[in-house]
Amino acid sequence: MATAASNPYLASSSILSSGSIVHSDSGGGMQQGSAAVTSVSGGYRGDPTVKMVQSDFMQGAMAASNGGHMLSHAHQWVTSLPHAAAAAAAAAVAAAEAGSPWSSSPVGMTGSPQQQDVKNNSGRDDLHSGTALHHRAPHLGPHQTHAGAWGSTTAAHIPSLTGSQQQQQSLIYSQPGGFTVNGMLSPPGSQSLVHPGLVRGDTPELDHSSHHHHHHHQHQHHQQAHHGVNSHDPHSDEDTPTSDDLEHFAKQFKQRRIKLGFTQADVGLALGTLYGNVFSQTTICRFEALQLSFKNMCKLKPLLNKWLEEADSSTGSPTSIDKIAAQGRKRKKRTSIEVSVKGALESHFLKCPKPSAQEITSLADNLQLEKEVVRVWFCNRRQKEKRMTPPGVPQTPEDVYSQVGNGHFLVDYLKDASLTGPSEPGDQRVTTTSSFHQVILAH
């Protein structure tokens, strides 16, 4: 307390009122204060060579403590460090300013809370502090030699720090010796006290091995991804038909389908029952007309090919025919009659619109047609004549066709009917003539 009484500048300082970490005795020596003894526990258990280096720096710190010029600059960045590092730095500032007449009140005011941080943060996790100090290590002022001096003073007068604080203290003055805050090169003589490899998590081997392991993991992942891309089926284009094949198959399919007597709707329904994929009549029609996309044509071709094989194999088997007929309605074959045969049937119809069964049989034999075909043709012809003949006409179609003979007689007949006078309300001649005119034009 002799220093506080003799020095008027430190009378109101909070460093002495709150219990300074270090005190200066009357003989000029340095000893630990009571607050420092109660706040920390355990002695300094370090390497003897480090103690020797610290003792050498302590002598330089004692000589530098008389000039307070470096302390005013050092205080500007001491308070910007993390809590644990700032606590150790503030303790060093307080120790150096104890015998300096140039100490200002802001330094003394910041000394007390930083001293409390030394007490409260003595058990902090060294991982957090080591990471933070590792990134903030280059923050040194221009007076780097003075910073090394008060760093050694801190190491000499606070020997009872815990293991984590010792590491933080080592990180304070183990910054890279090549650069300063302003980016200028430091003097050649200023070197780091602690080898960067001793800092936990900053070893080059660990960093290199971690980087190598990460790179190796990425390389394996890239190989797996590349192998996954190239592991698709190699036989994707072997069975793909060409456009010419699809066109030929569509034409052949249409001919065979008509020959078998199935409609497009029957084929679509049969595909749904046999293979599980129901297709509409429009889809089958578009396939035959080559109006589907190439992809859909390729998908539909094997199904239609299977259906054709099934239909061909079931031609002589009643059970197979019934199986296919159950998928849809089987249409009868459409009969196409030649022009000469149709003329013979027409002439026979004019003579006898309703032939008997014997006449139909003899006519079918003469024309080499089936009996059912001849019978159906006469039925359809009578229905057609009934649609063309209006009701109330006294003349029969046979009489009309027998009178017509050729087109000239028809024209004369229409002229005569149109030149007659106004008909009576009950007369139907004009209406009948116009109706016959429509019938003849239709033929």
UniProtKB/Swiss-Prot annotation:
Compartments in which it is found: Nucleus
Q: Which InterPro entries match?
A: HD, Homeobox_CS, Homeodomain-like_sf, Lambda_DNA-bd_dom_sf, POU, POU_dom, POU_domain_TF, TF_POU_3
Its GO biological process annotations read: brain development; regulation of transcription by RNA polymerase II
Q: What PANTHER family does the database record attribute to this sequence?
A: POU DOMAIN, POU DOMAIN, CLASS 3, TRANSCRIPTION FACTOR 3
The annotated regions of Polar residues compositional bias extend over 101-121
GO cellular component assignments: nucleus
Matching CDD domains, A to Z? Answer: homeodomain
Q: Which residues carry this modification: Phosphoserine?
A: S317
Top-rank lineage group of the source organism: Eukaryota
The record's keywords, sorted A to Z, are: Developmental protein, DNA-binding, Homeobox, Nucleus, Phosphoprotein, Transcription, Transcription regulation
What is the tissue specificity? Predominantly expressed in the central nervous system.
Name the DNA-binding segment ranges: 330-389
Q: Which GO molecular function entries does the Swiss-Prot or TrEMBL record give?
A: DNA-binding transcription factor activity, RNA polymerase II-specific; RNA polymerase II cis-regulatory region sequence-specific DNA binding
Native source species: Danio rerio
Annotated membrane-spanning segments are none
What's the gene? pou3f3b
Q: Which family does it belong to?
A: Belongs to the POU transcription factor family. Class-3 subfamily.
| Signal sequence segment | none
Compositional bias segments (type: Basic residues): 210-225
Q: What does this protein do?
A: Transcription factor that may play important roles in patterning the embryonic brain.
Give the chief site where it resides: nucleus
* Location of the region described as Disordered in the Swiss-Prot/TrEMBL record: 21-40, 100-150, 182-244
Q: What is this protein called?
A: POU domain, class 3, transcription factor 3-B
Q: Pinpoint the POU-specific domain residues.
A: 238-312
